[in-house]
Amino acid sequence: MKHVEIVAAIIHHEGKFLATQRGYGDFKGMWEFPGGKIECEETQQEALIREIREELCMKVEPHQLFCTTEYDYPQFRLTMHCYLCYIVEGTPQLTEHLAARWLAPKELHSVEWLPADIGVIDKLAQYAKL
């Protein structure tokens, strides 16, 4: 089975988390944390900064690795490294996504997340209660 490794940004701002609605592919319309594939010679943090700049025209600072999760889709196995991030500069501008929403911890389950993101959401909801 094909293996895909990605990074995802859990962008935290004013007590809320940024969710983006996928604008392409099999999962168009579903929600995810923004991010993408790690390119050759790139660290996870470098990939995350690049992907957020490309997708949302923002500069973020990865603060810490929140979790790494694995999920088996029918076509591939996904490894997703999720980082808590803070905004350094900019506001979300949609270049690849249909929409973006800032969700309070109690609102995290209010959108239809991609299957791989659901476990992250459960962990994040618990983390936000601390």
Question: Could you say what each language-model-derived stretch is?
Answer:
Residues 11-12, 19, 85-87, 102:
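Conserved hydrophobic "DFG−1" position in protein kinase catalytic cores
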Residues 26-30:
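A conserved beta-turn-beta hairpin within the catalytic core of GNAT-like acetyltransferases
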Residues 84, 93-124:
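NUDIX/MutT-family hydrolases
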Residues 59, 69-91, 101:
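Active-site-adjacent beta-strand/loop module that shapes the phosphate/pyrophosphate-binding cleft
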Residues 1, 125-130:
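Generic C-terminal helix-cap and adjacent flexible tail
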